[in-house]
Amino acid sequence: MAKDLKFSEDARRAMLRGVDTLADAVKVTLGPKGRNVVLDKKFGSPLITNDGVTIAKEIELEDAFENMGAQLVSEVASKTNDVAGDGTTTATVLAQAMIREGLKNVTSGANPVGIRRGIEKAVELAVQELKGISQPIESKEAISQIAAVSSGDEEVGQLIAEAMERVGNDGVITIEESKGFNTELEVVEGMQFDRGYASPYMVTDQDKMEAVLEDPYILITDKKIGNIQEVLPVLEQVVQQGKPLLMIAEDVEGEALATLVVNKLRGTFNAVAVKAPGFGDRRKAMLEDIAVLTGAEVITEDLGLDLKSASIDQLGRASKVVVTKENTTVVEGSGDPEAISSRVAQIRAQAEESTSDFDKEKLQERLAKLAGGVAVIKVGAATETELKERKLRIEDALNSTRAGVEEGMVPGGGTALVNIHRQVSELTLEGDEATGASIVLRALEEPVRQIVHNAGLEGSIIVERLKGEKVGIGYNAATDEWVNMVEAGIVDPTKVTRSALQNAASVAAMFLTTEAVVADKPEENGGAGGGMPDMGGMGGMGGMM
């Protein structure tokens, strides 16, 4: 296929048009008075959002050269979202500022490679300074503030802070759509897995259709149980103790299941059978997790263990087990705390080493089930459009909070970037490298300018005053006041601010060193789009009648 080429100034200008188109659409959402963007969807109602990365991913431009520029900035937003989960609009604003400022200098004869080195050195110093003014997040109130700033909603901030307090920083917090209007928090204590009872006759509470076992023994095996004789010896030992039994096996069927149900209905013995969660290797790992949590031993032929010779010592215990049609929850398993914490450390190490996002997510879920529990934030709204928008905001807030817990927080509202302006300006560089550093200095002011601009005021006045204020004092665009940002609860996670700056600088440096751009030539759509050749002369077919 034939290609179109553009060189030097032409190439960069064409790509800059794309950068500006995308960034201008994204940056209107920045700050407490930022607006929303409406995205057309082929099916269903349009999506209304203020999430930078969601907007950036939707934008594709007709001109191939402009589209390349737009996609470069879109990558800044995506990368920041992958690393920190929020700050995508800030990253886009920073990238646009660095690219525009850098392009002016390259056009007037500066060397792009020197500029690139200057940008990299200035950003490295800026990141160090950000870490220097960062404060750790320890209180529930600080967590609530970060989530509230990200979502623009104090109620969401409190919900996320409560969820993290209940399930711990390692806990799984999922976001689901609610059937009602209200947004609420639901916490599942203990370990829950998605397998229910093998037979509805096993329920103990007919109204709720659930089986509740108080202080039960727990048998864990990876075998199918079809013959009751296999488990009879261990069943007799449990009956003597007068306690209920939870059986977790690959499957319980046929005569074994029938015997358990009959004994339950007669009131002789209370046992609930549940299929093992997961599949393949993940199933083995999950059974091992349950065993560690309850102090049981997984009875598996891999270890040379047999059900017939199993004893009551190999069973686990828990204070309570609740089994519904779809889920089983084990509360307060009586496993050894040291064994549990070493298992948690092992899973955490696996998660850090894993390169697959899917595996990471599954390991994180297992970690949460062992370490604390699972919290579900059910998002409610009046319409589907509002629900989608609210759900996106809460997801951003949750990511932002996690990033904050990891690396601490800095004054929000773009203040931290201006706070480090003086230290970065003291960096002594020569020639084009000094030009690169000045590009970063100008970009550090841009998020504040944009937040103020979105609030309907002049950014330059605020930025100049902010440079003279001491660290932490900033402009609250929501109330039009100068406040101590941390005390006012306007904070950003250090990780989010740092990632936004690093990713923006990376793409800007690449952009400025671009000297040629190659794109596919647009196809000429001629007439009937390559149909069949002239079909004249077929009129004579009448003679075939």
Curated annotation (Swiss-Prot):
Subcellular location: Cytoplasm
Principal location: cytoplasm
InterPro entries in the cross-refs: Cpn60/GroEL (IPR001844), Cpn60/GroEL/TCP-1 (IPR002423), GroEL-like_apical_dom_sf (IPR027409), GROEL-like_equatorial_sf (IPR027413), TCP-1-like_intermed_sf (IPR027410)
CDD domains: GroEL (cd03344)
SUPFAM superfamilies according to UniProt: GroEL apical domain-like, GroEL equatorial domain-like, GroEL-intermediate domain like
Domain of life: Bacteria
GO MF entry, a single one: isomerase activity
Gene Ontology BP term (one): protein refolding
E.C. number(s) listed in UniProt: 5.6.1.7
Gene Ontology terms: cellular component: cytoplasm
Entry keyword set: ATP-binding, Chaperone, Cytoplasm, Isomerase, Nucleotide-binding
Protein name per UniProt: Chaperonin GroEL
